[in-house]
Amino acid sequence: MFSKSEFREVVKSMGLVFGDIGTSPIYTLTVIFLLTRPTHTHIIGVLSLIIWTLIILVTVEYAWLAMSLGKKGEGGTIVLKEILVPLLKSSRNVAFVTLLAYIGTSFLMGDGVITPAISILSAVEGLRIIPQFENIGQSTIILISAAIAIALFSVQSKGIEKITWVFGPIMVLWFATIGFSGIASIFYTPEVLKAINPYYAIRFLLDNGIIGFFVLSEVILCATGGEALYADMGHLGREPILKAWRFVFLALVLNYLGQGAFLIRNPGSTNFLFEMINQQANILYIPFLLLSVVATIIASQAMISGMFSIVYQGITTRIIPMLKIDYTSGVFKSQIYISTVNWLLLVSVLFMMLIFKESSKLAAAYGLAVTGTMSITGIMMTSIFYHRKNITKALISLFITFIDVVFLLSNSYKIPHGGYWSVIIALFILSLILIYTSGQKKLYKLMKLMKSKDFLEKYKQVYATQNKIMGTALFFTRDIERIPQYISHVMFKNNIIYENNIFISIIKSDSPFGIETSFTKEPAKGLKILEIRAGYMEIVNVEKILKDQGIGEKTIFYGVEDIFTKNIIWRIFSIIKKVSPSFVQFYKLPTDELHGVMTRFEM
């Protein structure tokens, strides 16, 4: 049994991790049987495919294999890259793995656009089961769904930590409801239980050939959100998520079996979950519909928070441009809000709703990004286990990667039917990452960085002979061994020397969390070096660190790059740099003390 604290953590993970996969029963079977006839044999075969997809891709790939590869408790695609890169000897392999991580991140973010759209639309479409609303137009459904999405995204800037405590209990109620509903339906058609045998899944694929192969592209919808188990491991811990998954898995399997049993009895049904609930307890249908809408909102909220987290991780690992970040909680430092991401997501979600109009059509675009992410996770896991000489797990991981790729290939047919949208979104994000990272490397090479030894020689000479300004000046530098051009301009070209000069270097460590601050030895009179070593998931409050160190700065200098180029790619990079907040804006340093020093670069 659980202790009280363990129980609370398990319930909490229900609300923050399992919203997406938990609301999949609303639309998964309904969409599958648009592709294939609901005969008795087909229903049993599809149910078997769903059960074994949940076992292989979620339980084995994520709950067992991926979650055994955490780094200081943190999970996700970037973490897999951080684990794998030190194991590789070839720089070519490192570049390939880095590209894979970028593609995986892009797919994950592309998938995030579709999740709220399909979840909210599918729940609101349940209104049609109510007799008074059976003729409600699709435009009204879209309007209601859009209003819910707008309301959800509009409250993000206020912070949602005050209400997140209710997410867990609501999702526990959701899973209990769909689980018991499934049991009630199975009671009347117990033969569906034979779908637990994988023989029926294999037989369905063999009997149906190419159609069976394409059905896999919709079966994968039952596992969307499975990647959240690993991605959210750092926030909630491995054990609570695994314990919660046992309950969630049971509820999902029971509900899918129940829907299959209902479909055997009612082959003319079109919206299986809602019609099953309505038939079982008509008086409770409206409360259930409201519960389903709230569950999809919770699923969407988890995606939004996850997106903020992924983008922040990308910013701190320098693969995504800096964006304005607000902290929405004085208690939970991980509660952040990124306005650019929030409003771009809302526009994208509304666009998806307007373009596809129905959840069943939106399913045509869903799954491609998910299977892409799963395949990349499988490849990286297999490589890690192989390099660690864990041959058993490497072979199991290789088999699962093969299954992932089969699902990915089955989703290729979706590309001309709307799947191209998820590809376009992922390619846009990937292009942004590649242009930004390549531009930063190119820019760094163009910088006339001064070796520390040469700088100190000149500094000592200038400091001894020049008049000094009273007070303390701060200078930011990435590498204390190679001094940026702007510092040389300030001190040697403009002859601006303060009594006390402090170089601040913020170094991102390989670990996700932890902040260490220390002054290194004083290299010269009037010059100190402050190193801030922070985990790549840490939110660094530089102003607080300066106060804690007793630094009363008078002026903060920072470099500004002015890029001149005729190359179209570098022009895009230049625009990205111009619209992105500067280093000092990102860290929210006091504006009245800031002095930007511009240096022009021709790329």
Curated annotation (Swiss-Prot):
Pfam families: K_trans, K_trans_C
Record carries keyword Mitochondrion: no
Keywords linked to the UniProt accession: Cell membrane, Ion transport, Membrane, Potassium, Potassium transport, Symport, Transmembrane, Transmembrane helix, Transport
Topological category with respect to the lipid bilayer: Multi-pass membrane protein
Chain segments annotated as transmembrane: 15-35, 43-63, 94-114, 135-155, 163-183, 209-229, 244-264, 283-303, 336-356, 365-385, 390-410, 415-435
Annotated compartments: Cell membrane
Predominant subcellular localization, coarse grouping: membrane
Reaction equation(s) it catalyzes: K(+)(in) + H(+)(in) = K(+)(out) + H(+)(out)
Similarity comment text for this entry: Belongs to the HAK/KUP transporter (TC 2.A.72) family.
Protein name per the record: Probable potassium transport system protein Kup
Source organism (scientific name): Methanosarcina barkeri (strain Fusaro / DSM 804)
